[in-house]
Every structure is written in structure tokens, then in C-alpha cells.
């Protein structure tokens, strides 16, 4: 390979666990590797991924601190004098710039950020940082990997599907009139893509603001970053002159008055509340949506039946606990 071949070492310099490698030991190991003269750079991380809680410390999710491990990466850089790389929830350009300017890193890893928007570098070079699609820390990508699936992105449908779904949207040969009913994530994505294709797009939404169920989930402080999915699409749509009508519940005749060439129904799902075979307990039955929206303030003894095993059930439990209720969760899931 020759003397100019670049060799780097990626490793954990602080396992954050009793009996594991400590920060001081990690620095000592890094210094010994430097003294060997065999390596040119370090790629530093902190923690372990042997459990789900440990993995979220090493690869932080939405609601956690931004770039929480820059300190140890900076210590390695200062102790060894070698170029240092690091990636751990550095999800935006401002944080990346700080990491370099403050002397913590020489190279910033933005893994999930590039899954959300693979054109980050190009947009920086072109002075279009405001158009970067933000990583919201949903960790859908990692959830899929650890379930044996492909690494996809909740915010960018093209990621992982490049063979069939291009990141760059081409213009249509003929411009058409498109009407979309619903301004949740699906409706906004349909509007964005249609407008990017050069179509004339109108969106109707019954609520007073866009977002749909994402607006509900984002009411919990630790999930507020999910609104980035909506805010980015709204900015894109507004820049392409998509017309929005909020507080507007439309029927077929309202839509047909616009003489559309294409109609897209994106009104989302409906909360499932048909839990009981009889109506005896119906007055006491509410949905997670009712709790997350604030329409219902839970009190007393609250039983949450969670068939989905996703965020909504536990978020509802969190809101109920904060309201002072006594909460019990029932689920068919094993864990």
C-alpha cells in the first residue's frame, strides 16, 4: 500500500459503565496508538450499545442533548494532536461549525443528518443552508436496522430506495392542477413533490394549522423536534407557491369546483376506540389523541391499553402522570 496509505482507528474511549474503559484509560490507549506511529486519525465515540437505553446514550434520540460527547472527542484531540473525527447527534450545520471552531474536531460525522438530506454539503456550498432537510432524531433508521430491515428515514422516503425513488425530483412534461385534502405529513409531501414537478397545487385542511398527527406527538416536549418534518415541508411548499386553505372542511363538490386533474386524499387515520363489545364503559373511554391534544385531562386511576407498542401509548402515559393520575399500562407486547 505504500507509506502514504491513510489508516485511522475508530473506537470507544469511554464505555460509561462500571468495569469498562474509563475516559482516562481511553486517552491513554489513544496516546499509545499515536506513539506507535501507525495511525493517522482517530474516530472517537463514547458508550456502548448492548441495551436500548445504552444505545440512546451513545446515539441520542429526539429530546436528548445535541452533540453530548464532544467533550471526550476534544480531549482525545488535545491529548494526541492527531486529527479527530466524531459522530453523535451533530444534526445541524451550526453545531458542526461549533465543533470545528471550538477545537473539538477536525472532521464532523453527520450520519443521520445525511440520511435525512444527502445534499447537505452541496447546499452549504451554494449558500442554501435554510433548505437543508433537518434530522429530527426519530431514529426510525436505527429502529429498522435493529429489527433486521433496511435503514430508511422517516423524513426522507427516498433514502434507502434510491433505485426506485430519486432524491432529485424531475419536472413533468405537462403541468396539471392538483388538489390535496389533508395537510399532515403525507399531504404536505404530496404537495411538495407535485409542486416540484411543476404542477399547480392546492391543499385543503380542516384544522387551523398543518401537521396532523405529528402536531399531536410534538406536543410532548421530548418529541417537539418532530415538527421539523412539517415545518420543512411547509417552507418548501410556500417557496413553490402552493395554495393552502386551513379551517376548511371540504366535500366532493368543493374539490370538483377547482376542476382538478388529480385529487389526493390524505386525511389520515382515525383513533381506534372500539375496545369493548358493549357500550357499558364507553363514557370512560378516551383515545391517546384526546390526552395528547389536551382535550381530556386525565385524573384518578388511568388504564392505558396499548396495542401498537409505539410512541402514542407511552406519551399518553407520560402526560397522565404529569397531570397527577395513577397510570397502569396493558399491552400484548412481551416487553
What are these model-predicted stretches?
Residues 212-258:
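N-terminal Rossmann-like dinucleotide/flavin-binding domain of flavoprotein oxidoreductases
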Residues 175-206, 245-259, 266-335:
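Rossmann-like dinucleotide/flavin-binding elements
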Residues 57-65, 168-170, 175-176, 216-228, ...:
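Short, contiguous acidic/charged loop-to-helix segments that flank catalytic cores in large enzymes
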